[in-house]
Amino acid sequence: MTHTPKDGPRANQDIRVPRVQLINDEGQHQGVVTIQEALAMAAEVGLDLVEIVPNAEPPVCKIIDLGKLKYQTQKKAAETRKKQKVIEIKEIKMRPNVDVHDYGVKLKAIHRFIGNGDKVKITLRFRGREMAHQDLGLKLLQRVKEDTSEIAKIESEPKLEGRQMMMVIAAK
């Protein structure tokens, strides 16, 4: 049986070295012993001999329950996966002639999204003759930029794409 890292640590008869540094089931260092002695000690207490540090000279082995070790490793991996946050891009849509109160509501939402660690894409949609007043849209995005400058940085500067002007901001 060949050992691959995804199988987990080598255990019992899979350990193919003549001598190992042994740590018993109570965590006490037993010194360097032969593999046969280590296997006998593990069998005595009804546990497995597991290679903990394979790169050491001689390798470090511990007498523990292999099933319990695998369970703890899986649990640790699941915990780290749970703690990782996927950064999403939230979108806030506005018009160039947005009212003061509406702007305040949108700004609050931007602050909330940034506080949650997400990126925010602010989109200004121009309709009809509003395209002639792109400078108003640029001023509005500059205002958003200034109002969020203490908590966010600009990831992509305001740019015009078709009838929309957009800008992306992210937490500092």
From Swiss-Prot:
GO terms for molecular function: ribosome binding; translation initiation factor activity. GO terms for cellular component: cytosol; membrane. One of its GO terms (biological process) is ribosome disassembly. InterPro entries: T_IF-3_C_sf (IPR036788), T_IF-3_N_sf (IPR036787), Translation_initiation_fac_3 (IPR001288), Translation_initiation_fac_3_C (IPR019815), Translation_initiation_fac_3_N (IPR019814). Keywords: Cytoplasm, Initiation factor, Protein biosynthesis. It comes from the Bacteria. The keyword Protein biosynthesis applies. It is found in: Cytoplasm. Its main location: cytoplasm. Monomer. IF-3 binds to the 30S ribosomal subunit and shifts the equilibrium between 70S ribosomes and their 50S and 30S subunits in favor of the free subunits, thus enhancing the availability of 30S subunits on which protein synthesis initiation begins. HAMAP family: IF_3 (MF_00080). Belongs to the IF-3 family. This is Translation initiation factor IF-3. It comes from Bartonella henselae (strain ATCC 49882 / DSM 28221 / CCUG 30454 / Houston 1). The lineage of its organism: Bacteria, Pseudomonadati, Pseudomonadota, Alphaproteobacteria, Hyphomicrobiales.
